[in-house]
């Protein structure tokens, strides 16, 4: 019940836009705020979909990047990369396009470290991508791609 309520509240807030407009904020700060809000939205979205989130913003010393969300989808451990963008015009890159080969390799390294650190070597796992496109005044468009890529595919 709580995930449904929280998701409804976030849907309302998201319809007002993820990034706050401010004359004092740089584009980078606005993008960071939108990303944080997108990850919070994704957290509640996944909970509503039945995922059990066990880690947020996981980092390891010496490895570039972070795992946005780590969650169980049933018995499968899902490493979820969240990408939030303002709605793209036709022909423009989508949020999913931001996950290039280097990003996938970094995510795979982080995932292997997470699995080792938690002693989850016998647990099946995959990489999911949750893309969020926002337009002020409208509900976000959410696309969840299960098994979006593997560490062995480029």
Show where each model-derived region lies.
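Catalytic cores of nucleic-acid endonucleases
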Residues: 83-136
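Conserved catalytic cores of phosphodiester-cleaving nucleases, focusing on short active-site segments
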Residues: 46, 67-90, 107
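Residues at secondary-structure transition points
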Residues: 29, 33, 37, 64, ...
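Interdomain/boundary linker segments immediately adjacent to catalytic/signaling cores
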Residues: 1-40
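A short acidic/basic microdomain associated with nuclease active sites
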Residues: 47-62
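Short, low-complexity, polybasic intrinsically disordered segments
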Residues: 133-154
């Amino acid at each position: 019940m709580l995930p449904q309520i929280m998701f409804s509240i976030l849907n309302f807030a998201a319809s007002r836009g993820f990034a706050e407009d401010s004359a004092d904020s740089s584009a980078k700060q606005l993008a960071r705020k939108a990303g944080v809000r997108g990850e919070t939205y994704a957290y509640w979205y996944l909970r509503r979909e039945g995922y059990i989130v066990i880690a947020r913003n996981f980092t390891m010393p010496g490895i570039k990047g972070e795992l946005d969300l780590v969650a169980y989808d049933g018995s499968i451990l899902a490493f979820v990369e969240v990408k939030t963008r303002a709605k793209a015009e036709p022909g423009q890159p989508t949020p999913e396009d931001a996950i290039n080969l280097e990003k996938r390799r970094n995510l795979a390294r982080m995932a292997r470290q997470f699995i080792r650190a938690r002693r989850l070597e016998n647990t099946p796992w995959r990489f999911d991508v949750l893309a969020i496109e926002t337009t002020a005044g409208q509900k976000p468009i959410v696309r969840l791609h299960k098994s979006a890529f593997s560490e062995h595919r480029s």
